[in-house]
């Protein structure tokens, strides 16, 4: 692997010409090297952005995510379903290497196989981040396992986030993965400001947070909430704050969870927790919310390593 190119293989093709005689080459100005064009899925994700060098030297160009409705245009905020995973896009697009970080949740394994065959046929290296060994959006793991059984053997190089994941990849597919831990997801200036506030704003309240956002298949808040409510109630000066999205907790929410909503309102009315119901938080509001907590409890059954965990780490929240 070549750290200077963001962890991608050295054997990525580049433009070159026939060797010139030594006496000519000595007097010839260095030819401009074509930048390495990387198609990353998704290109705007914080992990992918952190693969780039801090100082842009122009040696690597990362394509923007195409708009799913109009692939000729950059996607802006909406990148899913990813156009770059369509075999027809990979067959015609101008790029040197495809890096799949995540986003293949709904892609049939046969389509992924066709994609990898197109890449191999064009001589385009394929780098895969094994981001999830178990998909947090899937109740049943069969589809994700089948997708990985196509992608992992086909990849020219593998990246993963932890040594434990690398060991599992070695066990399941006999492949070695480069471990590149998840980078910070909160801007450095925001992290610094949060740490400074913590140093002088310590009060008598110990705030424990649980967030029941739009529920993934991997989330099971009711499995731990009764125990969490009882435990926090026994801690001197502790407050349990539960935040939830309107689509889960509002009476007309599109994904309302009736039993969860009823339990939370009952406990809030009894003074055993603070309940905050709101819409999706943008990054700034999310960082402020997490920084206000002493502990953030993750209600996951599987798929526990997430950007949420990394944000808490950066903001000093346990």
Predicted segments, located by residue:
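Nucleotide-activated donor-binding/catalytic signature segment of Leloir-type glycosyltransferases, i.e.
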Residues: 246, 253-288, 295
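Short N-terminal targeting/anchoring amphipathic segment
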Residues: 76-80, 87-110, 125-127, 298-299
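Nucleotide-sugar donor-binding and catalytic loop/hinge architecture
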Residues: 28-31, 191-209, 232-237
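Membrane-proximal helix-turn-helix segments that form the acceptor-binding/catalytic region
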Residues: 114-125, 141-157
């Amino acid at each position: 692997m070549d750290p200077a190119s963001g962890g991608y293989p050295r054997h990525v093709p580049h433009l070159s010409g026939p060797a010139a005689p030594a006496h000519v080459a000595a007097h010839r100005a260095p030819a401009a090297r074509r930048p390495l064009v990387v198609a990353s899925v998704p290109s705007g994700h914080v992990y992918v952005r952190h693969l780039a060098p801090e100082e842009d030297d122009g040696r690597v160009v990362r394509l923007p995510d195409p708009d799913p409705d109009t692939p000729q245009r950059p996607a802006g905020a909406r990148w899913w379903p990813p156009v770059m995973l369509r075999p027809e896009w990979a067959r015609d697009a101008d790029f040197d290497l495809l890096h799949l970080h995540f986003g293949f949740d709904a892609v049939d394994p046969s389509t992924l196989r066709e994609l990898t065959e197109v890449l191999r046929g064009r001589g385009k290296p394929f780098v895969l981040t094994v981001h999830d060994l178990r998909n947090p959006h899937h109740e049943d793991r069969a589809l994700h396992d089948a997708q990985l059984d196509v992608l992992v053997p086909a990849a020219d190089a593998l990246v993963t986030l932890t040594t434990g994941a690398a060991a599992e990849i070695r066990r399941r597919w006999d492949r070695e993965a480069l471990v590149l831990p998840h980078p910070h997801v909160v801007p450095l200036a925001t992290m610094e400001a949060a740490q400074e506030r913590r140093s002088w704003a310590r009060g008598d309240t110990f705030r424990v947070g649980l967030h029941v956002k739009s529920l993934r298949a991997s989330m099971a808040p009711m499995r731990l909430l009764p125990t969490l409510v009882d435990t926090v109630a026994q801690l001197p000066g502790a407050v349990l704050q539960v935040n939830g999205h309107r689509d889960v907790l509002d009476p007309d929410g599109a994904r309302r969870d009736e039993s969860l909503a009823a339990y939370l309102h009952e406990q809030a009315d009894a003074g055993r927790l603070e309940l905050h119901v709101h819409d999706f938080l943008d990054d700034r509001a999310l960082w402020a919310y997490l920084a206000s907590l002493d502990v953030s409890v993750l209600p996951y059954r599987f798929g526990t390593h997430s950007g949420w965990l990394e944000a808490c780490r950066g903001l000093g929240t346990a």
